[in-house]
Amino acid sequence: YQTERLLIREIFADDFEEIWENQIGSGFETLEMLEAYTKEQYRFYGFGFWAVVERESGNLIGVAGLTLPREWKGEGDWYSLKLPPPEGEERYFEEPLELGYHIFPPYRRKGYAKEACLAVLDYGRHQLGVFHYQAWIQRENTVSQRFAAQLGFRKKEKACQGF
C-alpha cells in the first residue's frame, strides 16, 4: 500500500532487529516470539502489522496494522470507530479489529502516524471488508487519545472482549 510519502509493506526478516530495538516488541517476551508471530500473521489472518517505510529515504520509520483484539495490561481504555459499509459491500468481520501503530521517535510529529493509520483503515475497509475498529490507549497517553479522536475514534464506556 502506498501513500503520498509512505510505503506500507509486509515486515521482512531484515526489519526485526530495528523494530525490536525501537521497543515495538513490548507485547512479546523475546525477539524470536516477535519473528514467529510476524512470519505467520499474514498467512493465517491475511492482515497484521506492516512496516511503515518513508518512500523518499527508504528508511523503516515504524509499524502500523490490524490485529485481533487482545487483553492489555495496565490502566487504559478502548476507543471505537464504526464506518458505514458501502452499499452492497460484504462484511467479512462482524467483530472489530484492533488498530495499532508505532512511529519511531526521530520520525514523530511529521504526520506519518496519521498517514499510515488512514491507509491501514482504508485497506481494512476496502480489502478486508472491516468496518468496525478499536484501539486500546493507556489513560495517561493523552497524545494518543487526541490522535484517536482525529481519526474518528470515540472512547467506549465498557471494554470490548474481542473474539
Where are the model-predicted features located?
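Acyl-donor (CoA/ACP) binding surface of acyl/acetyltransferases
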Residues: Y1-F28, V53-F163
